[in-house]
Amino acid sequence: MISAPVRVARPDDVTEVVRVTNLAYVVESFFIDGERTDEAEARALMAHPQSTFLVIDDPAVKGRLLASVYAETHGDRGYFAMLAVDPAHQGTGLARRLIQAVEDHCRTAGCSHLDLDMINLRTELPAFYARFGFQQIGTAEMGDRHKLLQECYRIKMSKPL
């Protein structure tokens, strides 16, 4: 078990956030053309005042991340996306720790609900998030479609905090 703490990402973590996110999201290459994110997007998300990335460092390699997640708050609702764990460390509880950290972060910010969405083609994800208490609350069309290789839509899930 990896005991490194969850912490708030710093601006100098952007390259590693992008690396671990793109590595984890290679599984989406059958419906997304190119990488999941880039440094410009990560910097823009990190700069937003109600947004943050939470990360877990690799205790064996200075400056390397094992996992990251994006979180934001809007009034009484929290939201997270881009949950990413280095494939070599998936199944070790890092995702669970990050989800718990997002929940704690959002509760501290005064949120009463936590939301997420996923692409319907990732058929394993609704059951994964249901294990953490999330329930499907609806669907939505995809916004930016320029990288899509297949038709898809977003599944929206939420849970009370």
Task: Describe the role of every protein-language-model region.
Residues 85, 119-120:
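Short amphipathic helical patch at the helix-1/turn junction of helix-turn-helix
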Residues 3-6:
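Extreme N-terminal starter segment of soluble prokaryotic enzymes
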Residues 149-161:
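Terminal substrate-recognition subdomain of acyl/acetyltransferases
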Residues 115-119, 126, 130, 135-152:
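Conserved catalytic-core motifs of GNAT/GCN5-like acyltransferases
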Residues 8-14, 18-90, 96-101, 105, ...:
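Acetyl-CoA-dependent GNAT
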Residues 106-118:
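Conserved GNAT acetyl-CoA-binding A-motif
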Residues 98, 122-125:
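Conserved short alpha-helix immediately C-terminal to the canonical SAM/SAH-binding motif I
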